Amino acid sequence: MEAPQTRWLSGDQQRAWRAFIIGMTLLTDTLDRELRHAHGISLGEYEILVRLSESPERSMRMAQIAESMQHSRSRVTHTVTRMEKAGLITRCAAEGDRRGVEARMTDRGWDLLVEAAPTHVTGVREHFVDLASEQEFAAMGKLMNAVADHLLAVNPAFEDIRDNVE
């Protein structure tokens, strides 16, 4: 059987693709730098606090955190260890499953999230949302939903991720 012919990107498509990659890299680096400077936490740490804040009892299994962030369990474990040392999170055995581990946000973690959220939202608006018209932003959301739907269709293992986005 013959391999399918490669459909190369046009010049415009290549420029748009590179702009997307560069823009996302610069955006996440900038948001991370702003949070570190103002509050002493990374963007990844902030995102863990957000996920915990949205969970019942501000608690989640470590594996769920890793899945929702698309990070390895090892990476999340290292991040949570730092956060635990800073008093932002505690870890305990998962209820009903001694093999599982849950991370729970402390009051100190909650207070830091409440303090850092305006910095983060201001950065997201200034460096991303407010740069596009409502129509452009809606189109981008529609495109990213199409990307997610496609990737879910070809890899059902990603379904848990979609549940954490909606």
Model regions: which residues?
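C-terminal regulatory/oligomerization modules of transcriptional regulators
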Residues: 1-11, 134-166
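N-terminal leader segment of winged-helix/HTH proteins
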Residues: 1-39, 86, 165-166
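Charged, amphipathic alpha-helical coiled-coil/dimerization segments
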Residues: 2-5, 81-139
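Alpha-helical linker/hinge and terminal dimerization helices associated
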Residues: 24-27, 31, 69, 112, ...
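N-terminal helix-turn-helix DNA-binding core of bacterial DNA-binding proteins
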Residues: 29-72
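Short, hydrophobic-biased segments on the C-terminal half of alpha helices
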Residues: 62, 80-81
